[in-house]
């Protein structure tokens, strides 16, 4: 059982006490199946990205064995082409409810594996997971376009969807950097990954026209920052430009404008993005503003709140919402592994392409 002593570093004024943090971790553990799968909640589906985020939160809370089981579930049920399906009913690997294979879902394993290694120093774990990391990266990079962006999925029949999503590609950028860190640790250079990472970063920084227009979604606003492609003054300018458009003071972050709906996951990710920019005070304010989503009985968090109607919606207590909040708190609390995978200055950057005369960095 998770004790408050194991979650003392997850204490944050106005956000979590040690007891509350331990309660939240127990809530995620209660959702996890014996085989390691972490669905959104029991009876709902599992997707590989949110499963990984919840596992990272378990590592941040010191629940390393449970996190390892989550990653081993992914390794056991990886498709021969290196992918995972988009949805599994209640985390049952034999009950696939969406046979699409989304690139950002598949890439995120590398973030979780590197985070687990930094949390534990477990070389044997890294050895076991390396083949799955390699296969997943190769699946993802097979959909990279000539302009650097990543096509967002393969259809169930294998047809590639070459259109790219800015949020998904930004998440993939972080994942590729973590994959390069794993390769460096293993002393197995991956020059093709370095080129792919640099090309993707350039597309995110300099070519918005290469991505589908999802400007209404808050994730497209902050993910280039959270994924590490956009840094420095350009990142700060982007944050300020749409702040009033997406942030609802005292309530959290809109998922999509103009809907009057704030969501816990987006709010926690924005807080992480602010931490990346060195704006910990504003990150804390965002996390404090979403405590109205906390369910005191389970320790988990409601997905969202429609503030015009003063209504929780949907009425779902998701493992990944709790996971995102724990990770944001862990970063603000200085958890070394969490800081390393989200801080832009602690991961390999890849090789910038010679294109447009653009600078290699994100300034």
What is each of the regions a protein language model found here?
Residues 1-49, 60-88, 134-135, 140-147, ...:
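Low-complexity, Ser/Thr/Pro/Gly-enriched N-terminal "stalk/linker" regions
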Residues 2-14, 52-66, 108-125, 170-187, ...:
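Well-ordered alpha-helical scaffold segments within catalytic/enzyme domains
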Residues 5-7, 15-16, 22-23, 47-48, ...:
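Extended ligand-binding clefts on enzyme/binding-domain cores
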Residues 10, 43, 56, 98, ...:
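Generic anion/oxyanion-binding catalytic loop in active/binding sites
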Residues 12, 47-51, 55-144, 287, ...:
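Aromatic-rich carbohydrate-recognition surfaces in CAZymes
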Residues 28-31, 61, 74, 81, ...:
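Alpha-helical solenoid scaffolds that mediate protein-protein interactions
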Residues 43, 84, 230-239, 256-266, ...:
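CBM-like carbohydrate-recognition segments
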Residues 85-99, 151-164, 246-249, 305-311:
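Acidic/His metal-coordination segments adjacent to aromatic residues that form catalytic metal sites
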């Amino acid at each position: 059982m998770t004790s408050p002593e194991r979650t003392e570093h997850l204490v944050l004024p106005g956000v979590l006490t040690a007891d509350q943090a331990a309660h939240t971790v127990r809530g995620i553990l209660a959702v996890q199946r014996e085989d390691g799968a972490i669905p959104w909640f029991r009876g709902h589906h599992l997707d590989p990205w949110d499963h990984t985020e919840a596992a990272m939160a378990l590592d941040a809370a010191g629940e390393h064995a449970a996190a390892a089981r989550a990653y081993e579930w992914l390794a056991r049920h990886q498709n021969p082409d290196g992918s995972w399906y988009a949805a599994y009913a209640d985390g049952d690997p034999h009950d696939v409810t969406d046979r699409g294979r989304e690139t950002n879902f598949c890439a995120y394993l590398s973030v979780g594996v590197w985070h687990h290694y930094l949390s534990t120093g477990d070389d044997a774990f890294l050895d076991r997971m390396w083949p799955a990391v390699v296969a997943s990266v190769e699946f993802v990079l097979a959909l990279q376009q000539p302009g650097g962006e990543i096509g967002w999925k393969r259809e169930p029949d294998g047809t590639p969807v070459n259109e790219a999503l800015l949020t998904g590609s930004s998440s993939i950028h972080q994942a590729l950097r973590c994959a390069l860190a794993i390769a460096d640790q293993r002393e197995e250079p991956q020059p093709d990954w370095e080129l792919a990472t640099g090309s993707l970063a350039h597309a995110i920084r300099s070519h918005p026209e290469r991505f589908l227009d999802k400007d209404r979604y808050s994730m497209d606003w902050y993910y280039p920052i959270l994924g590490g492609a956009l840094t420095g003054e350009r990142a700060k300018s982007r944050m300020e430009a749409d702040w009033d458009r997406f942030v609802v003071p005292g309530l959290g972050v809109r998922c999509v404008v103009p809907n009057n709906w704030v969501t816990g996951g987006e709010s926690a990710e924005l807080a992480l993005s602010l931490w990346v920019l060195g704006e910990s005070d504003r990150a804390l304010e965002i996390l404090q503003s979403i405590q109205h989503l906390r369910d005191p009985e389970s320790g988990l968090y409601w997905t969202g709140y429609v503030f015009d109607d003063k209504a929780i919606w949907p009425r779902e207590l998701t493992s990944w919402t709790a996971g995102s909040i724990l990770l944001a708190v862990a970063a603000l609390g200085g958890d070394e592994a969490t800081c390393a995978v989200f801080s832009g200055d602690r991961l390999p950057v890849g090789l910038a392409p010679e294109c447009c005369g653009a600078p290699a960095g994100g300034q």
